[in-house]
A protein has these predicted regions:
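Short beta-strand-to-loop capping motifs
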Residues: 11-15, 44, 74-79
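Intrinsically disordered, low-complexity regulatory segments
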Residues: 34-51
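Terminal, regulation- and interaction-focused segments at domain boundaries
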Residues: 1-31
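A short, structured beta-strand/loop element
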Residues: 47-63
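Short, conserved charged micro-motifs
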Residues: 17-22, 80-86
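Intrinsically disordered, low-complexity regulatory segments enriched in Ser/Thr/Pro
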Residues: 58-79
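A general secondary-structure signal for short beta-strands and their flanking turns/coil
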Residues: 2-8, 47, 67-69
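A common structural junction motif
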Residues: 28-29, 91-99
Length: 100
């Protein structure tokens, strides 16, 4: 988990698209959201919006291990630092796997 989340950032997630879609409802929590293809628009309860887009990436290979990857792009609009942090902390806890 980070201490600061900028208004726009990208990250890789070690999951398949099917896994991500299964996590999506819980990761959104109480916020209203709508999916359109490989994107989701989220209406944040404290005001502001979040747009997330994803695309499958080639797997990450470490020795004999292959990890699936999704490229994720996050864009907050009209959300202050507190609203971004509050949403992303829940999101990160919900999607965290292993010891990471």
């Amino acid at each position: 988990m980070q201490s600061h989340y900028p208004a726009s950032f990208e990250r890789d997630m070690a999951c398949t698209e099917a896994e991500w879609l299964a996590w999506l409802p819980k990761a959104m929590g109480e916020h209203d959201w709508q999916r359109a293809g490989q994107a989701v628009d989220v209406q944040l309860q404290g005001g502001g919006q979040l747009h997330i887009e994803w695309k499958p990436l080639p797997p990450r290979t470490i020795a004999l291990m292959r990890l699936p990857r999704l490229g994720m792009a996050f864009r907050f609009d009209g959300a202050d630092d507190q609203a971004r942090t509050q949403f992303m902390r829940r999101f990160d806890l919900t999607t965290q796997r292993g010891g990471g």
